[in-house]
Amino acid sequence: MEDIDQSSLVSSSTDSPPRPPPAFKYQFVTEPEDEEDEEEEEDEEEDDEDLEELEVLERKPAAGLSAAAVPPAAAAPLLDFSSDSVPPAPRGPLPAAPPAAPERQPSWERSPAAPAPSLPPAAAVLPSKLPEDDEPPARPPPPPPAGASPLAEPAAPPSTPAAPKRRGSGSVDETLFALPAASEPVIPSSAEKIMDLMEQPGNTVSSGQEDFPSVLLETAASLPSLSPLSTVSFKEHGYLGNLSAVSSSEGTIEETLNEASKELPERATNPFVNRDLAEFSELEYSEMGSSFKGSPKGESAILVENTKEEVIVRSKDKEDLVCSAALHSPQESPVGKEDRVVSPEKTMDIFNEMQMSVVAPVREEYADFKPFEQAWEVKDTYEGSRDVLAARANVESKVDRKCLEDSLEQKSLGKDSEGRNEDASFPSTPEPVKDSSRAYITCASFTSATESTTANTFPLLEDHTSENKTDEKKIEERKAQIITEKTSPKTSNPFLVAVQDSEADYVTTDTLSKVTEAAVSNMPEGLTPDLVQEACESELNEATGTKIAYETKVDLVQTSEAIQESLYPTAQLCPSFEEAEATPSPVLPDIVMEAPLNSLLPSAGASVVQPSVSPLEAPPPVSYDSIKLEPENPPPYEEAMNVALKALGTKEGIKEPESFNAAVQETEAPYISIACDLIKETKLSTEPSPDFSNYSEIAKFEKSVPEHAELVEDSSPESEPVDLFSDDSIPEVPQTQEEAVMLMKESLTEVSETVAQHKEERLSASPQELGKPYLESFQPNLHSTKDAASNDIPTLTKKEKISLQMEEFNTAIYSNDDLLSSKEDKIKESETFSDSSPIEIIDEFPTFVSAKDDSPKLAKEYTDLEVSDKSEIANIQSGADSLPCLELPCDLSFKNIYPKDEVHVSDEFSENRSSVSKASISPSNVSALEPQTEMGSIVKSKSLTKEAEKKLPSDTEKEDRSLSAVLSAELSKTSVVDLLYWRDIKKTGVVFGASLFLLLSLTVFSIVSVTAYIALALLSVTISFRIYKGVIQAIQKSDEGHPFRAYLESEVAISEELVQKYSNSALGHVNSTIKELRRLFLVDDLVDSLKFAVLMWVFTYVGALFNGLTLLILALISLFSIPVIYERHQVQIDHYLGLANKSVKDAMAKIQAKIPGLKRKAD
């Protein structure tokens, strides 16, 4: 019945929002037959719950339920969220839940006796029923999906005109619960229902509900039918609308629900509720509290008050009815819901649609939403009562924040004493009711603002952490149940689908309601709490982990679950979710659980610590918006699950050390990658079983390898952890790098390999452990990983202390091995550079002295750095070749290489240092060189750098100047020689012709005229060309720019070095000439003076024959002709010159012999 009712309720609830019925119809995938079956099951449960309904009816003064009226006072006392104690809810027939519940008690329910109705069945049913029941009286809701309407019919028979019941008109605007009229002690009734549910061992609470009996209605007062934010409103929905419809017989219940639905519209008419409902509807599931923008807190408070009264009066009976219905329906719904459950693909599609349809409520900060079966059903219920729930949830969220924490604590205590370990549900905790309408999870304490939701959730979590008594035992039971449930269709991702759909419904009441109903009907009732639990744990562990954008609401649920899981021992956002966790749901597989875990706590005010999860796992508070935005296109659940399973085995070993920090980085990963990574990481990190002995170890490990975890980004599926240990997956550094560096990296990789081996061991064990409870599955791996990592970390962490620029590694690091190796290299590098290395990095090259002689200090220092790793290097040298070094940026690679180059290679190149240092190699050239060449180039660059550093700035400048001067001199010399010898005929011809023309022009015109003409000729050429190019560009519409731009931008200034060079040379010649002339004119040597006199006498004749320009012309001609002639006839010319020289000497000897003075001087 529950399945049918839930689907129908979901349909009605989805219909109840103002959305057009056709949209809902289209979106509802649920089949009418399935819903009818569920309705029948629900009717059966209602029969069992008749007594509860009677009590509820009695408690429901305004509802006027047709069922046997139980005095409202008799119903659980007004459930005051603020009150510390929760009035015991009359148990009544709750224990006598319809056999359907026991029959189908999902594996998530640990024990029929202890099934804590995460949501009172009546409440769950009521939300679903109210939309339908209320629809006929008020405005008929858009025809729910086939599956939804049948459910509504059985649940909707208006047997008793409830107090102005909210009409399940299918419009959210119509408050499913009327604050003034119907908001009677609904809260107490929910509490009572919870108590009753706790008493009802036969009642099977939905996976999310079992462990949260107290959380069910108390925190879930705003159930799907009720405004998700308003706990009371939810309860009113469940109690006023649905409970009133609940009668001793199924028909009576249905009638009562119908009447309650009628009452609900009236209540919905409440201006406060009406205003808030539309807004709340969006929030009902994922954003119950945060999405209610329009709902004033005052209104929320009013709603809470009214609903509290109604709930107090009706809560017990309704709770009993709802609990029994919910408990039964969760049990029955697994089958019915399975029927209604759309294939995981459909559910994923629906979920995607919901995601797409998600509106403002995208916040989904409410992490309390756990993937309940009810959460799926919540979609159905949500449609009809979403608005009401949202409004009430909003009201209740405010009131609940203040009161619910105490009241829930008391309630949880009372409920726990009543045989339920679950803590009182927190109003902020959305409690999906198993019944179709109740299926959606609503946070009673959600406030209209996200802040209130977050505040409520976290305070409640903190306050009720003790209240939530789901212990590691419960977790284990859930795990066991989950293992069994994994095989069932529910194990498919119904949680994600249902939650997603329901969340989308909350967010977008118009378009999502359709999808949510279909998705809800398709979803298995139970959201494997185990999955949720694991998801919560991994999420808490990876709270900063990726959040699936499409999973916005799912993330909320998952987050809440993860928070509850993580808080599970310590604090829980929502007891109802805790119950969901405690009650393993057969629907979701562990991977799904883990995958949702990835979703971060929605904008959690403070990070929630998850005792069951390693303390390190506690996710730092992360804004939901920032987190959820990243994974926008989640893969289908099946794909995600498959990928997660595969990646789980492979990445568990790999990411375990990384999982702590990787979760945060994975925020952007797609759902699949998130699921896989989170699963891996979550399991690895949160693997520790209830005994937290491993957590401290993990914490130590995390501390020891924080940087590694930060650097490691393997969590994303892109990292392909399986390949991380294979050489193929590791980027190879060009083997041009020095062997020393290779050894260094290899030593690092060796360490990483050790870790990898441990991880691989874990990976081999993990596939077998996948079926094991989440906490237990990976503990062994954690230990092994810790050991491996701890062994490697001492050296790495010490080096890591050195400030490193991680950006350089981000591009190349994809695996632990790579990370370790690259990190090790950089650490060494940083130590060498930053700590003691005086060497500066020039041109992006860490310039190291190639020879130990040049840099004994650096070599010694580097050797010291290497000493710790020498053993590792020695070990690795044998097998290092198999592992390619991590390819790092050029600068980084060189930095890593240089230190070892000094140690290992400096001797090799020390002999060549003088020649090597002279040559400079560019980084690009070095990277292109072969290993030896690269080593040599590195050494050269090192030597060059060191030399430059050793030199004083002035020395360096002088050397640079001399170098440039030499280069320019060489260029000039080479060019002049080439010109004189006509090496380049064109060039020489141009120079020779221009020079000769200039000299000839000077013979005709004055130098001034020649200069002017030359300038005009030049300008005429340049201007003409400039205009020509401009015209061409205009015609071609090209934008080439100035034709002489290159020349204009080129440096034409004469360098100071060049000037100094030539000036120094000229100055020397001038000085020597002056000295010589002084000697000649002062007759230092009479003979030399006479020779000079004869020479001058000869020039007098030459001057009479030749003009100065003529001489210049002759000299120019000779300059360009004699060298060529001499080069071609050098032998002959040398022979004749020798003969001439000999004859001249002979003549001089004769003359000197005749002149005694000359002879003596010659001697």
Swiss-Prot record:
Show the PROSITE patterns listed in the entry: RETICULON
Origin organism is Rattus norvegicus
Q: Does the keyword Cell inner membrane apply?
A: no
As annotated in Swiss-Prot or TrEMBL, what is the tissue specificity of this protein? Isoforms A, B and C are present in optic nerve, spinal cord and cerebral cortex. Isoforms A and B are present in dorsal root ganglion, sciatic nerve and PC12 cells after longer exposure. Isoforms B and C are detected in kidney, cartilage, skin, lung and spleen. Isoform C is expressed at high level in skeletal muscle. In adult animals isoform A is expressed mainly in the nervous system.
- Encoded by which gene? Rtn4
The protein in question is named: Reticulon-4
Looking at the keywords, is Metal-binding present?
no
Point to the regions of Low complexity compositional bias.
7-16, 62-79
Modified residues annotated as N6-acetyllysine in this record: 1075
Q: What does this protein do?
A: Required to induce the formation and stabilization of endoplasmic reticulum (ER) tubules. They regulate membrane morphogenesis in the ER by promoting tubular ER production. They influence nuclear envelope expansion, nuclear pore complex formation and proper localization of inner nuclear membrane proteins. However each isoform have specific functions mainly depending on their tissue expression specificities.
Bias (Basic and acidic residues) ranges: 406-423, 461-474
Describe its assembly: Binds to RTN4R. Interacts with ATL1. Interacts with TMEM170A. Interacts with RTN4IP1.
Biological processes annotated in GO: axonal fasciculation; blastocyst formation; brain development; cardiac epithelial to mesenchymal transition; cell adhesion involved in sprouting angiogenesis; cell migration involved in vasculogenesis; cellular response to hypoxia; central nervous system vasculogenesis
Instruction: Report the residues modified as Phosphothreonine.
Output: 347, 429, 832
Q: What's in the keyword line of the UniProt record?
A: Acetylation, Cell junction, Cell membrane, Endoplasmic reticulum, Membrane, Neurogenesis, Phosphoprotein, Synapse, Transmembrane, Transmembrane helix
List N-acetylmethionine occurrences by residue: 1
**What ranges are annotated Lumenal (topological domains)?**
1011-1104
Reading the lineage from the top rank, the first entry is Eukaryota
List, in alphabetical order, the Gene Ontology terms for molecular function in this entry.
protein-containing complex binding; ubiquitin protein ligase binding
